[in-house]
Amino acid sequence: MPRRDLVRIVLVGDDGVGKSSIITSLIKEAFVTNVPHVVPEVTIPPEITPENFTTSIVDTSSNPRSRPHLLSSISRAHVICLVYSIADPSSFDRVAEYWLPLFRREGINVPVILVGNKIDLRGGRVTNQGLEDESAPIMREFKEVETVVECSALLPLNVSEVFYFAQKAVLHPTAPLYDSREHTLKPKCLEALKRIFTISDVDKDGLLNAHELNQFQQKCFSTPLQSQELDGILEIVRSYDPYAVQPLPSSSPNTPLSRDSSYGQLHYFNNNVVPPSPPQEGITELGFLYLHTMFIQQGRMETTWTVLRKFGYGESLDLREDFLAPKFDVPSDCSVELSPLGNQFLTDIFEAYDKDQDGALSQNELDDLFSTSPGNPWLSQGFPDTTITDDMGRVTLQGWLAQWSMTTLLNHRTTLNYLAYLGYSSSPATDLPTPTALHVTRPRKQDRRQRKVTRNVFLCYVLGATGSGKTSLLRSFVNRPFKGGEDGLGGYEPTTKVLSVVNSVEMEGVEKYLVLQEFGSKYESEILRNSKRLDMADIIIYVHDSSDTNSFSYISNLRQQYSLDHIPSIFVATKSDLDLAQQRHEVQPDVYCRRLGLQAPMAVSSRLGPLHNLWVAITRVALDPTSSLPRGPRSQMSPAQRIRVVARWGLAATTISAIVAVWMKWQGYSFKGIWGWMAKFAGLRT
């Protein structure tokens, strides 16, 4: 939900309590003796308020004849100022007996500010404690009551504060954050603040040190944290709970800074004077939560709301849609990759959660990493078997970056979501919108036309008959062991869902990522009929079992059934460790490929492995796609383009024939003579 640009304040209460006088005192900045019974609606323009929103102030009457206007006004209110007269105790009694129950009966669910007017008529002094004791029973029973303000329209005194608290109740409401009955943070607020603490804890040591607190302060309030302020924060938290302030681990980076400066601002000294270090202590999550509880209890809700909004939260304490899914347009024929900033952020977060520094993320480390998000986005896709892991099945940095490269290529929206969840926009290294972590590539057609591919991630569709060894190829690509039984038999499992794997291939010192997708018989035809899905493919890998006489026919039939010649292709003959079988096809695979102008099928064995030469060959095709287009340059046209070309030639031929016919008729030829003339012209008749 976006921030409001209008705050509608409605004043309600018994007649004679001074509602109209409060409004006129605000506008005139002085008491006005003769005021209308109901003041017309007042609009305060946005430039008057520091937060740049329009304020509308509506007066009402409790007269029964004005009841429709009263009910209409409170139904459209963003906040209600319920006014009573300190000089008339019965008007205070009616707050709980009449007015607040009326709001509930009418289904009004907005903040209420209790306003005690005419304090100039009170006899004797009332302490803050006395005022709190008087209003506490009402606030306990009616949670919609945000605060109590006393004022005098006559003096005037505290009049502007009435409207300040009313505006604040709308822009920075207490109800979503704090349970005033239990005196605790509400669950959603607690969850959000815990996530913010985790993201702000850059080194993931469970503490916010001086450097991290300064970065937090800069992000949320655009001002550095002074050393005295930090000392005060530590003292406040320590007085609440000594265990909420802990010594920093020896490995925690806490940059030494000048004590007369702000933490986080680095100074260099040439006089050999070593500046004092910042406190070697940090606040725990408990201490961080206590600070925000204290802010709210002190009426400083705007502090907590500023923090929440800076970290992407909306009024409902959910991450905003525009924060999770910002506008990011991808032109047709282009793909999306991680930018250098995105790669660096994902590298940094991997290293931060690799607590044992063994170069791989265990399951517990992965769980911690995704704790600020809805969870691991790849669980249903077979992760971590989709990428590179160590011998114990733990994802490595290479596999981690490869997995994100695949995710970004296949569904960049997921990457944008998770960059937000993981704190990219809150990272001290970036503090930039999440789209800066992504990069839109040049169109494929432009790459092919200029014969220079600028992309780094390529999508390869793996097609072939059931049992041809497609899944084994995918497993081999991510260094998974061969699953076949004796003599390659007994280990076959049919593919029932889309399988995607990713790995990098080094070409002349540069890493390129290949994403291999297998669809299985259930989804293959659906993909091949979908022109948009086909256009996403950089390469088609046609796989046949060289030991199965019927395997290659499947590929030939597939190519006849679907228009695939506009996609670069490579043919692979699997199970080369078994006896070569003569294919039941009009021509053998090598001849078939030669007729297409392609290399003969590469013979491979997933059982014997490794298949490095195959991956290099596929990457070469990706980098020089025009060299592997079936039947040469004409095949670069998509099926739709071919239809348009044929239609244009057909139209041209029809037009020419019509012109010739008209001309010949004008010359006096009969149609029989015309066809004879045309045949003679074509050399078909002697």
UniProtKB/Swiss-Prot annotation:
Pfam families: EF_assoc_1 (PF08355), EF_assoc_2 (PF08356), Ras (PF00071)
EC numbers on record: 3.6.5.-
Transmembrane feature ranges: 649-665
Residues given in the record as GTP 1 binding sites: 13-20, 59-63, 117-120
Binding site for Ca(2+) 2: 354, 356, 358, 365
Keyword tags: Calcium, GTP-binding, Hydrolase, Membrane, Metal-binding, Mitochondrion, Mitochondrion outer membrane, Nucleotide-binding, Repeat, Transmembrane, Transmembrane helix
GO cellular component, one term: mitochondrial outer membrane
Annotated GTP 2 binding sites: 464-471, 506-510, 574-577
Membrane association type: Single-pass type IV membrane protein
Main subcellular localisation: mitochondrion
Residue ranges, Mitochondrial intermembrane side: 666-686
Binding positions (Ca(2+) 1): 201, 203, 205, 212
Example GO molecular function: calcium ion binding
Enzyme class, broadest EC rank: hydrolase
GO biological process, one term: regulation of mitochondrion organization
Keyword Membrane belongs to the record: yes
The Miro domain, residue ranges: 4-172, 455-624
Subcellular location: Mitochondrion outer membrane
Cytoplasmic face of the membrane: 1-648
Similarity-based family: Belongs to the mitochondrial Rho GTPase family.
Function: Mitochondrial GTPase involved in mitochondrial trafficking. Probably involved in control of anterograde transport of mitochondria and their subcellular distribution.
Protein name per the record: Mitochondrial Rho GTPase 1
Originating species: Cryptococcus neoformans var. neoformans serotype D (strain JEC21 / ATCC MYA-565)
Lineage: Eukaryota, Fungi, Dikarya, Basidiomycota, Agaricomycotina
